[in-house]
Amino acid sequence: VNDTVDSYDNMISLCSQLTEIAPVCGVLGNHEDVKIYHQGDEELVKRFEDAGVKILRNEETSYSLYDNTVSVIGIEGKPEDFASYGAKECMEAQEAEDQYDLRICIAHVPTYFPEKLENYSFDLGLAGHTHGGIVRLPKLGALYSAEEGLFPEYGGGVYTLDNKATLIVSRGLGDSDKWPRINNVPELSVIDIN
């Protein structure tokens, strides 16, 4: 999503096309949170759902894919909200289930994982938010993230968490509303799970 504009038409069109290939689910980002919680725009969630996207708001869904049962849990908000809006209970409920072949956890803010989520059992974590650090420097990587400041640890890429889960932080497709991307190509992550 291009955060500098209010129109989500391009993202919703992309999501609609992706649902023709596979199930699509996701979580809201901070810009969507502002539109929904501060501006009362629940229509945005409806537009994503009408396009076939399941928006996970501290909830879990599961899919049967190629004889495997996949659990996807979506955690919204920031790490400091973890115990307030049902995210903790959602993670605990998923942890109690043992029928899943693959557990995926999605949280918009990557620091959610080391701060709150890596004590839970999941195989793959997905996040975004940092826009790849906006500016990327050769050999140093991401320059800045709102949560981590200069040279963020989770500026974009693949990481192994303490619980041995893989965390993929996408640089995403959109721009920041304050700075242009420099040396930081937008990305749409395609993850092949074997």
Q: Language model features by range: what are they?
A:
Residues 59-66, 157-163:
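Short acidic-hydrophobic surface loop/beta-edge motif
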Residues 1, 23-30, 56-59, 104-107, ...:
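Active-site neighborhood of phospho(di)ester-bond hydrolases with catalytic His/Asp-centered motifs
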Residues 1-7, 32-42, 80-85, 139-151, ...:
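Acidic/histidine-rich helix-loop elements
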Residues 110-189:
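Conserved beta-sheet core of the metallophosphoesterase superfamily
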Residues 15-21, 96-99, 117-120:
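Short, conserved loop/helix-junction motifs that constitute active-site signature segments
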Residues 1-54:
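Membrane-embedded segments
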Residues 1-3, 30-34, 61-63, 77-81, ...:
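Solvent-exposed loop/turn segments at secondary-structure junctions
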Residues 39-53, 65-107, 113-115, 178-181:
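Binuclear metal-dependent hydrolase catalytic cores centered on His/Asp/Glu-rich metal-binding motifs
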